[in-house]
Amino acid sequence: MRVEAVVEVRLTEDKKKVLKALENVFTPVNIREEPSDVGVVLISTCDGHKCLEKLRGAIWRQGIQDAARSVISKGVVGEDTVIFSINKQAAYVGVVSFVTEPGESPLGPITFTVKTSNVRQFIDWLAPRTYRGKVYYEAPPPD
């Protein structure tokens, strides 16, 4: 599994705070900066599920597995890719809030692109189905 997280750092923002927001939900292995017309874009990558443990933990801690599953499932692109976004300001305080509409996150979202050989297993691991608030199947970590 390969994960890429992309987030804008606008000219009015503190790059350290944006990096903190990213690192509250993601453990990047590599981070590179690219210039953009609104500031810079941080592009962070990693291989394997370990880098998404913070995001998974926040989803479980907040008890939003079903909502997360619904949003993430709508982001399936093709047979091996999932794309979803979360609110950068919420991530700064350690909360996961999914962005489903353009412009919903005024300072721009954190956008995740996950490439995996088994999309269903990835979704079942990150945000499993629940029944009456209890997880009834916890998938093993994806490739």
From Swiss-Prot:
Give the InterPro entries listed for this entry: PAB1135-like (IPR002739), Ribosomal_uL5_dom_sf (IPR022803)
Could you say which residues form the signal peptide?
Answer: none
Residues in a coiled coil are none
Do you know which PANTHER family this protein is assigned to?
A: UPF0201 PROTEIN TK1335
The family line of this record is:
Belongs to the UPF0201 family.
Entry protein name: UPF0201 protein Pcal_0593
Q: State the organism named in the record.
A: Pyrobaculum calidifontis (strain DSM 21063 / JCM 11548 / VA1)
